[in-house]
């Protein structure tokens, strides 16, 4: 009974955490995280050292094409860089844990729910941990300029879509929706219970950057040079993420239903 209660509590925390990011994905440029989640001095940082759009575009380039539920978790997790390093080290020591056993074990760790949810995706954790400077910059930008970051995600998705590099596949669906007079590109898992992490070269999918893209990390065997998007083996996420998030929950997240 204790394990069930812990798992239920973690699932609810993950729902709450991702729902906040979902509301940001809903209408880029308008929705902000609740004020209490912003660190002291964030307002001053925004006005004194606001990151320009071109730099934000490059900052989000490595993850902008992630399916929305994974994008939400990754952005939230990037605000906890130390815990990302701790999770990577923990995963190295617990390679034998899989599925529910992994979910139960990680739920006992004192980490943010967004960090715990990434335990099922070690390649994403490795990407974030291997370039912790970029991850920290991404997290700081998300805390200080949430809507600007989401606008950047949409700009990069539009670039990839215009070049024919972002479209519906067996692994994910891509739709363009108009919400509150804004055109938004929605990326969802083809199977809500299975995540496929895309690997890609930003220069190939978006074109040459104005501001240099972060270094590229490719999971072993996942990416073929010159291809747009490559996908690895699908990962069942039911034990970690209960229910759908991202654009699929836009009405709930925005308070419309």
Residue locations for each model-derived region?
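N-terminal low-complexity segments enriched in Gly/Pro/Tyr/Ser
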Residues: 2-6, 10, 14, 21-24, ...
